Amino acid sequence: MAAWSRTRLRWTLLDPRVVGRGLCPQGARAKATIPAALQAQESTEGPGTGQDRPRLRSPAELPGTGTLQFLFQLFLQGYVLHLPDLQVLNKTKYGPMWTTSFGTYTNVNLASAPLLEQVMRQEGKYPIRDHMDQWKDHRDHKGLTYGIFIAQGEQWYHLRQALKQRLLKPDEAALYTDALNEVISDFITRLDQVRAESESGDQVPDMAHLLYHLALEAITYILFEKRIGCLKPSIPEDTAAFIRSVAIMFQNSVYITFLPKWTRPLLPFWKRYLNGWDNIFSFGKKLIDEKVQELKAQLQETGPDGVRVSGYLHFLLTNELLSTQETIGTFPELLLAGVDTTSNTLTWALYHLSKSPEIQEALHKEVTGVVPFGKVPQHKDFAHMPLLKAVIKETLRLYPVVPTNSRIITEKETEINGFLFPKNTQFVLCHYVVSRDPSVFPEPNSFQPHRWLRKKEADNPGILHPFGSVPFGYGVRSCLGRRIAELEMQLMLSRLVQKYEIALAPGMGEVKTVSRIVLVPSKKVRLHFLQRQ
């Protein structure tokens, strides 16, 4: 009976008499679903319409899905936690450019490297991305200042100019090498404790969970110069509460994004979402307050000339680059960004190395050739480890931390692939789809780090398009913490491969992805760490 009801509902939702031509399952063009803001005028004037050029087409001529079909795909077909897979399906059906309508909004999806390049190279001084309304709803609800991830325009530019200090340049990131190595040493101690507790004496039952603790400890140490106990056998309760709150916030974000606002008082997702954010900001504010009090104590004791500028937040506060409210609005977001990028990427990298013993052995040989066993790698060593860098690049290609991004070009009309889009069109950049495009990456679903090495051979054509994989973004709105994240992953992977042989636990099978804004493993990744002699 239930199966019959689902089948009946499916055909009801897809019946053109119910949903109109824009939702036809065969992909009839969704002109009716394009709002007025996207109805580009087909006049004889404007860009690209001179006598010597073909007429630019209207966005209304693009194929795509309407609201009901999109909701059907999300909640009845189960794509709500697998949006990148839905984008792969839509590209196969519609081609590299299609629309998705949701309520009064219509987005233009771009799923090829040349299309991404066309949009990203037209960014202005203040690139606009998705407004992240759900994050703004929480900030507005609590009276918080917008942080770097949701601020736009001049406010975003001010935050960006302040926060890029001591982060963006490789030699600035190198300043954090000793701090990261200190945390990684503690992580390896904790790793050995977890291994010893396992039945086999060498297994880690949940690699992502353990690496999450590493990443949180590392980013907190960099931002606040404070250790918060993530790598101890017993984690402090406020730290554990923060970790739980991040998971709760992300899990409920998926439903908050796609359910209408009138459902918020009726369903549990909104309350859980708010509580998650409240705890995240409470944790961040506590760390900020402690650093402010520490700085005040130094000022009272030594005066302004005696203050020793050390860590990242200390530097920003001492130089008065951010107000108190801007600091409170931004630093909890930086904590989140610093955790998910490295922990998930390292998990995927170790998973694939465990499945690729030949690549792992080549990497071990490279690392120990530069840094023998017993020595700790330094920033300068990675200039001599091209395979290590290639492993990280290939992992980020297969699993971009944020599989989908967006841009809204507000200053002008935009010409993309023969179409003319009006100002304020939102372009969805399908990074996951693009980075698995066989025309850019042959055998796109296989783990092949050697494709990133400079030497081009018959079996290694190299990278065929520079925008095929841009996991840290592009231009002035690219990832602020890229250099820190790369350094942390290089240090972590090199030290693990130097000391252990990594093997996949029996019965693991294939690990798929789940999208909860960021891309995470669908199940616990169990690995064996075998001590090298």
UniProtKB/Swiss-Prot annotation:
- Which positions bind heme? C479
Record-listed N6-acetyllysine modification sites? K142, K232, K285, K296, K375, K512, K523
Q: Where in the cell is it found?
A: Mitochondrion inner membrane
Q: In a knockout, what does one observe?
A: Mutant mice show cholestanol accumulation in the cerebellum.
**Tissue specificity as recorded in UniProt:** Expressed in the gray and white matter of cerebellum (at protein level).
Where are the stretches annotated Disordered?
Answer: 34-60
Task: Give one GO biological process term.
Answer: calcitriol biosynthetic process from calciol
The entry's comment on post-translational modification says: Acetylation of Lys-125 and Lys-285 is observed in liver mitochondria from fasted mice but not from fed mice.
**Annotated organelle transit peptide span:** 1-32
Cofactors, names only: heme
- Keywords recorded for this protein, A-Z: Acetylation, Cholesterol metabolism, Heme, Iron, Lipid biosynthesis, Lipid metabolism, Membrane, Metal-binding, Mitochondrion, Mitochondrion inner membrane, Monooxygenase, Oxidoreductase, Steroid biosynthesis, Steroid metabolism, Sterol metabolism, Transit peptide
- Catalytic activity, EC: 1.14.15.15
Where is this protein primarily located?
Answer: mitochondrion
Q: In which pathway does it act?
A: Hormone biosynthesis; cholecalciferol biosynthesis; Steroid metabolism; cholesterol degradation; Lipid metabolism; bile acid biosynthesis
Q: Which GO terms describe its molecular function?
A: cholestanetetraol 26-dehydrogenase activity; cholesterol 26-hydroxylase activity; cholesterol 7-alpha-monooxygenase activity; cholesterol monooxygenase (side-chain-cleaving) activity; heme binding; Hsp70 protein binding; iron ion binding; vitamin D3 25-hydroxylase activity
Disulphide linkage map: none
Segments carrying the region annotation (Sterol-binding) are 386-400
Enumerate the catalysed reactions: 5beta-cholestane-3alpha,7alpha,12alpha-triol + 6 reduced [adrenodoxin] + 3 O2 + 5 H(+) = (25R)-3alpha,7alpha,12alpha-trihydroxy-5beta-cholestan-26-oate + 6 oxidized [adrenodoxin] + 4 H2O; cholestanol + 2 reduced [adrenodoxin] + O2 + 2 H(+) = (25R)-26-hydroxycholestanol + 2 oxidized [adrenodoxin] + H2O; (25R)-3beta-hydroxycholest-5-en-7-one-26-al + 2 reduced [adrenodoxin] + O2 + H(+) = (25R)-3beta-hydroxycholest-5-en-7-one-26-oate + 2 oxidized [adrenodoxin] + H2O; (25R)-3beta,26-dihydroxycholest-5-en-7-one + 2 reduced [adrenodoxin] + O2 + 2 H(+) = (25R)-3beta-hydroxycholest-5-en-7-one-26-al + 2 oxidized [adrenodoxin] + 2 H2O
Tell me a GO cellular component.
Answer: mitochondrion
Tree of life domain: Eukaryota
Q: What does this protein do?
A: Cytochrome P450 monooxygenase that catalyzes regio- and stereospecific hydroxylation of cholesterol and its derivatives. Hydroxylates (with R stereochemistry) the terminal methyl group of cholesterol side-chain in a three step reaction to yield at first a C26 alcohol, then a C26 aldehyde and finally a C26 acid. Regulates cholesterol homeostasis by catalyzing the conversion of excess cholesterol to bile acids via both the 'neutral' (classic) and the 'acid' (alternative) pathways.
Q: Assembly and interactions?
A: Interacts with HSP70; this interaction is required for initial targeting to mitochondria.
The name on file for this protein is: Sterol 26-hydroxylase, mitochondrial
